[in-house]
Amino acid sequence: MKLTQRLSLRVRLTLIFLILVSITWAISSFVAWRKTTDNVDELFDTQLMLFARRLSTLDLNELNAPQRMAHTPKKLKHGHIDDDALAFAIFSADGKMLLHDGDNGQDIPYRYRREGFDNGYLKDDNDLWRFLWLNSADGKYRIVVGQEWDYREDMALAIVAAQLTPWLIALPFMLLILLLLLHRELRPLKKLAQALRFRSPESETPLDAKGVPSEVRPLVEALNQLFSRIHSMMVRERRFTSDAAHELRSPLAALKVQTEVAQLSGDDPLSRDKALTQLHAGIDRATRLVDQLLTLSRLDSLNNLQDVAEISLEELLQSAVMDIYHPAQQANIDVRLQLNAHDVIRTGQPLLLSLLVRNLLDNAIRYSPQGSVVDVTLHARSFTVRDNGPGVAPEILTHIGERFYRPPGQSVTGSGLGLSIVRRIATLHGMTVSFGNAAEGGFEAVVRW
């Protein structure tokens, strides 16, 4: 793991701040140094030019007086004598030094090439100087004024340091203010972490996003959505466990009884075979119940459908009728398909829609008397599954589709989950299911979209 990944957010932000400030300060210093150096060079070049022109206004014919060189005063800078501030010398046209400032000027070599600025060195000195050569008005004299480059650079450095030092001094205070601001701004995150640390696994109370930075608020909202889904999942799991324990108690008790009967039958093969047959039927009922419980539990956990496709309801109903044909024939029930619309296409999950239709047909066949008819009719915006049985009492209709609800007095075995599965699948596909008694008689289920 990288070192930066082990550091806290506060330390990371502080390091980033220090790096950015250091880079900014370095770039600003470099730019200020270059700009100040250019300005200082321009200023001192102007000063050299003015000084040289003032020297050219002197009566240069009296320059042969030796006492002038002995009493030439030094240039003052900021009230202090500075030997490196300026130096000058005056030469004749043939290169003879006639006058100098009594200090560095006497070491200026005669290397006149043309009027203007030039760089060079003093005699027996390795420091670079800036020189300005100027001719007198009559052309008899060569005036040279010079200044050491180091002096200019020191001056530029002093100016830049005076400008940037306050920022460098202010850096610790800026860092302290940053740490205080980070501590205040990260306080909601600490509270959030503490709330998560002591949160009950079963709690559905959303996290308080008050004071949380806008960049972190989507994370808090996502966590609240996750907690809501987890709570819903736990509720479903508890309901599934409770339903399974409640509904499997009776079938398992019946299986135990049939097992005991088979054991007590002794040498009576008829009793033993009857008990084993009922045991086999009970196992089938328990298996069907468990399958339906698992199916309903999986459907409850779904929020979005996966592997959806364009489905032809005409082909879907035809396939479902063909699949149910053999069980219907065994029950002496005729299943008829009527297509009042063609090319009806819906987007959905093929297996789930097949399960929806199969459960409706299975329910119709289970509760229809022998010799009856089950009609499946497809319309443009719905399809209907109707039997011609006795129908359902009005007070019972309101409970049809509830989990584990079975009308009282029924001789047909079942779990009461088939129509609940139908309703859940329809909801996932944006459909509605209604149950009622048909005008022509019998019970009907209508699926609309």
Swiss-Prot record:
It is a multi-pass membrane protein. The chain crosses the membrane at residues 13-33, 162-182. Residues 1-12, 183-449 are cytoplasmic. Residues 243-449 form the Histidine kinase domain. GO terms for molecular function: ATP binding; phosphorelay sensor kinase activity. GO terms for cellular component: plasma membrane. PANTHER family: SENSOR HISTIDINE KINASE YKOH (PTHR45436), SENSOR PROTEIN QSEC (PTHR45436:SF14). The modification Phosphohistidine is found at residue 246. It catalyses: ATP + protein L-histidine = ADP + protein N-phospho-L-histidine. This is Sensor protein QseC. The gene is qseC. InterPro entries: HAMP_dom, HATPase_C_sf, His_kinase_dom, HisK_dim/P_dom, HisK_dim/P_sf, Sig_transdc_His_kin-like_C, TCS_sensor_his_kinase. It comes from the Bacteria. Residues 34-161 are periplasmic. Its EC number is 2.7.13.3. Keywords: ATP-binding, Cell inner membrane, Cell membrane, Kinase, Membrane, Nucleotide-binding, Phosphoprotein, Transferase, Transmembrane, Transmembrane helix, Two-component regulatory system. It comes from Salmonella typhi. It is found in: Cell inner membrane.
